[in-house]
Amino acid sequence: SDVWHTAEAVAPKAGVLQAKVHLSGKAKHVVCLTTAGAKKSLHILPAGKQVKDAIYTLVWNEKEAVNYVNDVEVARSKNPLAGEALHLLLRSYLPENVKGTGKMEIDWIRIYTNA
């Protein structure tokens, strides 16, 4: 398991997070915005929607979060982090009882805000 987490908050109450990502292997991959301590999160790579080579986008505001894969909406939900300071978290891990390896290669990550 590998984890990378920003120490300082990177995102305010609303914005856009985009990442151009290449995924491979059996590992599960996470790119998300989290609260301090990672108690709650908004995932840019929605569960079950991971595509090997894609541009993932998360658009969030006080009310909702919308996920896109290659500009196609794949998920929409209430924003559980409304009003929270958010940190960027990257993680790859092998689920329990899964053998093998995996790789997450990131070409770029962009965060746009109205700050």
Regions found by a protein language model. Give the residues of each.
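GH16 jelly-roll
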Residues: 1-115
